[in-house]
Amino acid sequence: MGGELPYFVVINEQGPAWDEKRSMRDQKGWTEHAVFMDALADEHFAILGGPLKYSKHRAMLVLSAPNEGVLRKRLAEDPWMRTGVLRTLEVYPWEVLIGKLT
């Protein structure tokens, strides 16, 4: 990886404000959440991401950050995190051994 920042795998799931009667894109604050995530991708902070097929809404992200503290602080700025639509379930440091993310 050279001088690149480490990678992390993050699993997020629906929070207490998630409305079970609505689809993901119909949740309150979807546009603000999408704009926030697009900005993280433009900054190369978010490398990959998207929903997982579970009964409860879960999403997986591959992020690049100097450390877990910085990562959690940035994710806490997500409008969906601030309003309880989404919450972080797990964070794992990740070493890429197969393939390339660049």
What would you call each of these model-derived segments?
Residues 1-102:
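Conserved, structured core segments of small domains
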